[in-house]
Amino acid sequence: MSGFNGTSTSSNSILSERQKDELHKSILDYFKTNNLHESFATLMREANQEGFVPDPRAKYAGLLEKKWTSVIRLQKKIMEMESRISQLQEELSAAPSAKRSASLNDWLPAASSARHTMQGHRLPVTKVSFHPVFSQIASASEDTTVKLWDWETGDFERTLKGHTKAVQDVDFDSKGNYVLSCSSDLSIKVWDANNDYKNIKTLQGHDHSVSSVRFLPGDDYIVSASRDKTIKIWEFSTGFCTKTLQGHAEWVRSAIPSDDAKWLVSCSTDQTARVWDVSSGETKVELRGHEHVVEVAIFAPVASYAAIRQLASLDPNASKDASASMAGQFVATGSRDKTIRIWDSISGQCLKTLTGHDNWVRGLAFSPNGKSLLSVSDDKTMRLWDLQSGRCTRTIEAHQHFATGIAWGKAKIEAPIPPAQDGEEAGRKQPEARTVNVVATSSVDLTIKIWTP
C-alpha cells in the first residue's frame, strides 16, 4: 500500500498536494463505504490521514465512483466521435474536392438537418451559445439554470446553479475558459470551466433585470444590458464597472460588440437601436424605423458587406467613412413589428426591410460566408434570407412553441492543403480555416435544437 502515500510518490508527480489529499480521502471514503476495513486502516496510516472521518456531505464523498463513471462516459464519447470521424472521412474521400469545399462553405440549415433535440430545462430556454473550440453548447433558461451539452452527441453534461431568477443570456470567452450568465436577479455570474465550473465572480450594479451579457473581443471586458435602461462595461479581472452608457428611454434588450471591440450595437423597448463608441461611451448613431420593441441587433460580418452593398444598390467600391471601423459598417435588427431591417451604421439609414415572419422576430445570425441571414421568431420558424436579394429562401418549422434564440457555431476547422498540381510550387499556403457548420435554436417549448449537415 506504500504507493498510496503522498510522501513516497515521485517528485515529479502531476498531482498537487491538495489533489493528492483529495484523492486519498476519496479512496478512504470508497473503502469505508464498501466495508474494506483492512485496506481503509492501511491507507489511513500510510497516507497520514489518521484523523479521517467519512462525511457524506463532503466533496470527496462518492467522488471515486463519479470519476470512474465519467471516464467510462468519456471513453464512450471518444469511440462515438472516432466512428463519426471515420464516417466523415469516408464521405469526404468520396466527394470531389472542389465540390466538397463549395458545399461545406455554402451549407445552410434545412428541415432535414435537425440532428438533436436536447431536453432538460423545466422552463423556456432563452438563449444558446457555442464553445469556441469544443463541441459544447451552453443554454440559459427561465428555470434559473445554465446547462451545458455536447452538441455532437446530443448528451447533457452538467447544470450550473446559482441564479435565483430567470437566466436571460449566456456567453463563452474566446478560449472557452469561462462562461458568463446574466439574470432577472440583477446579477452577472462568471463560471470557471477549469475549476469544475465554479461560480468565481458575481457582478452586481444593475438596478433591474440583466437581459444581455457578452465578452468583448480580447476577453478583458464584459458588456451587459439591462431593463434599468443602461448598458454597463465591466473589467473582467476585477469585476468593477468601468463605464455606464445611457441614452435609451426604455429597457435595453441587448448590447453586442463588433468583432474589433470598438463599437456596440444595442436595441431597446423604445423601438430604436443604437451604435455606441466603446472608448468614449457616446452614441454614434440612432437607428429609428421599427414600429415596436426591437428584440435583437447584431453587427454584420465583413464577409457579408459585398452582398449587403448589392442588396442596397450601393457602390461596391465606395470607400467607407473614416469614422467607421471595418467591423461595424452594417447592422441587422429584428423587432416585434415582425420585420428585420438592415442598416448602414454610419448614416443611420435603413437599407432594406425583410418581411415574412408572422410574429415577433427574436433572434438573428449571419452565415459565416456572408451570403445569408438566419432568423427565428415567435411564429415558431427559422427563416433563411438571401442577402443579395433580400428574399426569404427557406422557412423551417423549427419548434413547437416560440423560438427565442439562434447561434452559429464558433469553432474553426482547418482546411486541408490541396494537392499540388503540375507546375505548382510546393509549400503552398494553408487555406483559411472555416467556421464549423452547426446551428442551434432555443425555444419556449423547453428544447434546444441542433442543426448540422
Swiss-Prot record:
Keyword annotations of the record: Cell cycle, Cell division, Coiled coil, Cytoplasm, Cytoskeleton, Microtubule, Mitosis, Repeat, Transport, WD repeat
Domain of life: Eukaryota
Coiled coil: 69-96
SUPFAM superfamilies recorded: Lissencephaly-1 protein (Lis-1, PAF-AH alpha) N-terminal domain, WD40 repeat-like
Domain LisH, first and last residues per copy: 19-51
Entry's Gene Ontology molecular function annotations: dynein complex binding; microtubule plus-end binding
CDD domains (UniProt xref): WD40
Signal sequence coordinates: none
Family stated for the protein in its record: Belongs to the WD repeat LIS1/nudF family.
Oligomeric form and interacting partners: Self-associates. Interacts with NDL1 and dynein.
Name of this protein: Nuclear distribution protein PAC1
